[in-house]
């Protein structure tokens, strides 16, 4: 039995025993905190970690030396002082996460894609496989492609299971039913899908909402660290709009599983359009791709949309996104009116999301801006509606369309690496 008193990890044994906290639990917590600091700040010295965690230097040295021996973190050299003359005393040795300690497989299943790939712990892309899908693609096609791609990625990169942290699955909410995922009180139950995948692999598995995963990827995989960045709002465009807001870089639980609630926000109460739920002028009936196409169909004609009409050879069924973009640039009056109107409504939505969640950044994902000029038009619209402050907070997602599997990677890395203090996960899940 441990004697009462403080241990080197900053805990009191008597308190720990009374409250069911084991030495291993405390060790894991401290390792988690070390990894969290390194993730947030990048290379940091032991003395700075000790100061942040309010632990002794000796305690931090013991913790970090063990993690270095295990290959989880590494020393990367001395701290370079900006001033010419460095202060006297012991030099600061910087440590950082060894982002090649293990590799991660990510799988993201969304309405138009199955994306499978391999990354480092920092989200650097090493390999990928993508399959375009639509509403007719069945479960077997998705499952078979996923299994084949995982095996190919492991084989092509000569990786055994000891090199892999685990597999993260990011599933878009509208894909739940197609993959056999039931939802009760907003909570998805991944048990059936997990059981099917467990028959194919012994690797640790993580399942969650792909919107949440992509939001986390936009925090964790930033190449330039910002120690003051603690919360973002993340808006994903698609047939349904999805939203995640974070606090201290973790998703706020109440938003976690109902990411599509933003669809029901009213942004145009005087609209002629109502959606099936009965709401007038909600996001779903004003801003989604189907809403845009519905508006364009109503005005499609040789008189009102001459360029679009000619490009589509007189049939609206031939209209695609490239034609719409060209029609806008060629000054098809009705097309410009509709798209500019939607730009204003999106600005209203972004203004309201900003003031209701107070994020440091609003990150837009899957919005199809053709170029920087098109994105600037949105920022100008936001400036006009909500002011320069709100406009300055808007940025585009860092996750490329072809790398959507990084959503799954981010989910796995958080759960299996950071939340476990780097402890081996092979005996779990």
Which sequence ranges carry the predicted segments?
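Structured loop/turn residues at beta-strand edges in well-structured enzyme cores
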Residues: 162, 260, 357
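Conserved phosphate-binding catalytic cores of ATP/NTP-utilizing and phosphoryl-transfer enzymes
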Residues: 75-102, 207-233
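Glycine/GP-enriched mid-protein hinge/lid loop-to-helix segment characteristic of carbohydrate kinases
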Residues: 128, 198-326
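Glycine-rich phosphate-binding loop and adjoining helix at the ATP-binding site
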Residues: 129-151, 155, 161-231, 373-384
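ATP-binding/phosphotransfer module of carbohydrate and carboxylate kinases, centering on a glycine-rich
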Residues: 1-76, 81-89, 96-130, 138-151, ...
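Short, acidic Gly/Pro/Ser/Thr-rich loop/turn segments
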Residues: 112-114, 174-176, 242
């Amino acid at each position: 039995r441990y004697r009462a008193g403080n241990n080197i990890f900053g805990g009191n044994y008597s308190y720990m025993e009374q409250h069911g906290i084991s030495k291993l639990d405390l060790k894991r917590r401290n390792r988690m905190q070390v990894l969290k600091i390194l993730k947030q700040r990048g290379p940091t010295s032991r003395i700075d970690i000790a100061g942040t965690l309010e632990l002794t230097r000796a305690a931090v040295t013991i913790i970090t030396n063990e993690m270095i021996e295990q290959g989880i973190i590494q020393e990367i050299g001395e701290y370079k002082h900006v001033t010419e003359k460095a202060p006297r005393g012991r030099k600061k040795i910087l440590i950082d996460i060894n982002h090649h300690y293990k590799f991660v497989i990510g799988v993201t299943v969304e309405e138009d894609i199955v994306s499978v790939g391999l990354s480092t712990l920092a989200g650097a892309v090493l390999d990928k496989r993508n399959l375009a899908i639509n509403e007719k693609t069945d479960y077997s096609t998705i499952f078979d492609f996923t299994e084949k791609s995982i095996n190919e990625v492991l084989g092509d990169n000569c990786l055994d299971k000891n090199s892999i942290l685990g597999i993260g699955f990011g599933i878009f909410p509208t894909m739940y039913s197609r993959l056999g995922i039931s939802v009760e009180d907003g909570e998805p139950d991944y048990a059936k899908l997990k059981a099917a995948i467990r028959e194919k692999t012994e690797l640790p598995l993580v399942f969650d909402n792909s919107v949440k995963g992509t939001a986390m990827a936009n925090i964790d995989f930033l190449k330039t660290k910002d120690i003051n960045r603690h919360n973002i709002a993340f808006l994903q465009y698609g047939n349904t709009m999805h939203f995640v807001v974070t606090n201290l870089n973790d998703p706020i639980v109440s938003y976690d599983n109902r990411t599509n609630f933003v669809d029901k926000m009213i942004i145009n109460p005087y609209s002629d359009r109502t959606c099936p739920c009965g709401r007038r002028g909600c996001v779903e009936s004003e801003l989604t791709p189907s809403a845009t196409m519905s508006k364009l169909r109503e005005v499609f004609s040789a008189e009102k949309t001459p360029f679009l009409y000619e490009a589509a050879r007189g049939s609206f069924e031939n209209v695609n996104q490239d034609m719409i973009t060209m029609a806008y640039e060629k000054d098809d009056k009705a097309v410009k009116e509709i798209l500019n109107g939607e730009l204003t409504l999106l600005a209203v939505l972004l203004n309201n999301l900003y003031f209701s969640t107070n994020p440091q950044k609003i990150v837009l994902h899957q919005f199809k801006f053709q170029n920087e000029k098109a994105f600037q038009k949105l920022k100008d619209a936001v400036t006009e509606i909500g002011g320069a402050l709100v406009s300055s907070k808007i940025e585009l997602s860092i996750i490329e369309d072809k790398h959507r599997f990084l959503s799954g990677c981010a989910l796995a890395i958080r759960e299996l690496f950071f939340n476990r203090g780097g402890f081996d996960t092979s005996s779990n899940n």
